[in-house]
Amino acid sequence: MHRLFILFLLFLSNSIFAQQFIAAGKLTFERKVAQVSLMENLYENGGEDNIWITEMKKVYPKIVTDYYTLGFNNNSTLYKVEKENTDNKYMLTGLKPSDQSYVYQDFNQGLTTMSKALFENEYFVKDSVKQFQWKITGEVRDIAGFECKKAITKINDSVVVVAFYTDQILVKGGPENFNGLPGMILGLAVPRLALTLFATKLELTTPPLAFNLPSKPKFVKHSQIALDVEKGLKNWGKEGKAIAWISNL
C-alpha cells in the first residue's frame, strides 16, 4: 500500500509538471550539419566536383556539431552560440558559427536586433520580426521532455523547414529567426541543407537577455543582407545558393 502511494505521488508530480506553463528559462540547442551529404546533394552528378568532394571526405568530418543557447523571458528571446567548437572543420562558408553573432527578438514590440558575421563583415540588423507562413500537422514527438507538434514552412520560396513546437513554453519564439507558432520551437530540420537544431535541455531560470552593440551601430534591414549575399555569391553557383539559404535562417 505504501509503495502504491509513493507511485501515485510520483505520477501526480509528473502530471503537474506536464501541465506547467513556462514563461522564462534557458534552452540549450544542438545544431548538426551533415556537411558531406549537403555537398553531395549540391553537386549531384557534378563530374569533377564529385572528385573534389571525394577528396574533401578524407579531410573533413561528415557531421559538424555546435551548441547554442536560447534565453527567453518577458516575451523576448536571445539566441547565440554557447561556445565555438574549435575542433570542427567546415566545408562550406557560412556553416561556421561566430561567437559575435546573436538574434534578439522582442515580440512585444515586434522587433529583431541581430548581429551577423558574413564575408569578414559584421552586420547589425534592426528590423521587424520575420513572418512565416506555417502549416501545422497532426504529428507529435518528444523533445527535451516536452510533447511537440509539427509544423512546416518555406524560406527562399522553395526551401522547406520543419519545426516542432511546444505550447507549454509561452514565448512564441525559436532558434535563429524562427517564430510565430503557438509556443516555443524546440526542433528544426532543413532537409535541403542537411541541418537539424534540437533542444537538449531547459534550465528554469530568468536569464538576462544582454547583447553587445557598438557605440554608434549602423543598422540595416534583413533585405540588405540578402542583397549583399546575392551580390557576393553571384558567381558561386549551387554552393552560393546554399550559403544564401543558410544566411536567411
Place the predicted regions along the sequence by residue.
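Sec-dependent N-terminal signal peptides
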Residues: 4-13
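Extended soluble regions of mature proteins
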Residues: 20-249
